[in-house]
């Protein structure tokens, strides 16, 4: 696993666990990491956990004017007209296409304090929510200055990039992330119909180039969430086999190359995850 990641030019902290047993593998699993868009897992879990407790209605419609939307390359972030969507449909966009604008509407309705309370209740002591995605984008733009975001990828750049520093924003660990996923899949994070809805939403991600690339089988289901920001390439999710066994996976990586397009690095995450799951399956 380490050889695969190293040859692809990735530094990684990762953790893989059997959802229903004690078997686990990892390296640097307790190191704090800047989670980028993987943090949307914690956000949508808090939404549906609040729904299960009767404190929020995910079917409630929200008016979404164009002004004030957070920047991004997908979903509402690139739409040019006003819209009206429910909170659960916004959650679907936040997971399926990593829509930053949709996620920030959820932050506004669920609340940063509520997400932090949720992860504390679930025992995730090293996970902290500290900023909306619009604030994250603004910090990148401020750090880049006139050179633009591309300047931040230059290995020789002396600029401190706050978005890459776990202490500056949303953060977690690989072990906390797999713990969250295991609790979600066991129905411990959110029970009942809203727990089923949470599982449905987390199975909607469209990207297949990282975690899912390591499991190209029609009878193996992969649910996940990517995170991409400058040199960061993350993915976390659950791999479910037809024999009923299931595995929570979290890979937080940083590329050594400044290139934005690195398909070999992306696929290495899937390959390493497959090797880890195969080892747990014996």
Listing of model-derived features with the role each one plays in the protein:
Residues 1, 24, 169, 178-282:
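Structured C-terminal helix/loop/strand segments within mature extracytoplasmic catalytic/sensor domains
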Residues 8-11, 107-181, 185:
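Mid-domain, small-residue-enriched loop/turn segments at the edges of structured enzyme/sensor domains
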Residues 27-29, 86-90, 97-102, 157-165, ...:
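Flexible glycine/proline-enriched surface loops and loop-helix/loop-strand junctions
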Residues 59-73, 110-111, 133-136:
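Acidic helix-start/capping segments at beta-turn-to-alpha-helix junctions
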């Amino acid at each position: 696993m380490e050889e695969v990641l190293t040859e692809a030019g990735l530094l990684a902290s990762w953790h893989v666990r059997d959802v229903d047993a004690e078997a686990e593998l990892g390296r640097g699993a307790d190191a704090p990491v800047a989670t980028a868009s993987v943090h949307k897992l914690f956000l949508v879990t808090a939404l549906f956990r609040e729904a299960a407790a009767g404190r929020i209605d995910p079917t409630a419609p929200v008016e979404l004017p164009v002004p004030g939307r957070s920047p991004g390359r997908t979903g509402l972030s690139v739409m040019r007209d006003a819209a009206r969507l429910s909170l659960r449909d916004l959650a679907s966009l936040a997971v399926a296409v990593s829509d930053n604008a949709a996620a920030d509407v959820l932050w506004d309705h669920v609340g940063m304090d509520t997400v932090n309370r949720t992860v504390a209740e679930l025992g995730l002591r090293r996970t902290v929510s500290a900023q909306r995605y619009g604030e994250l984008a603004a910090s990148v733009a401020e750090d880049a200055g006139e050179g633009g975001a591309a300047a931040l990828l230059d290995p020789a750049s002396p600029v401190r990039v706050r978005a890459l520093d776990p202490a500056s924003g949303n953060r977690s660990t690989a072990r906390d992330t797999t713990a969250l996923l295991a609790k979600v899949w066991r129905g411990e994070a959110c029970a009942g119909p809203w727990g089923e809805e949470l599982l449905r939403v987390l199975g909607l991600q469209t990207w297949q180039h990282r975690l899912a690339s390591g499991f190209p089988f029609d009878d193996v289901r992969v649910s996940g969430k990517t995170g991409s920001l400058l040199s960061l390439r993350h993915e976390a999710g659950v791999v479910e086999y037809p024999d009923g066994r299931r595995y929570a996976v979290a890979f937080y990586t940083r590329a050594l190359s400044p290139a934005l397009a690195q398909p070999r690095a992306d696929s290495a995450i899937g390959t390493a995850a497959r090797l880890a799951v195969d080892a747990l399956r014996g």
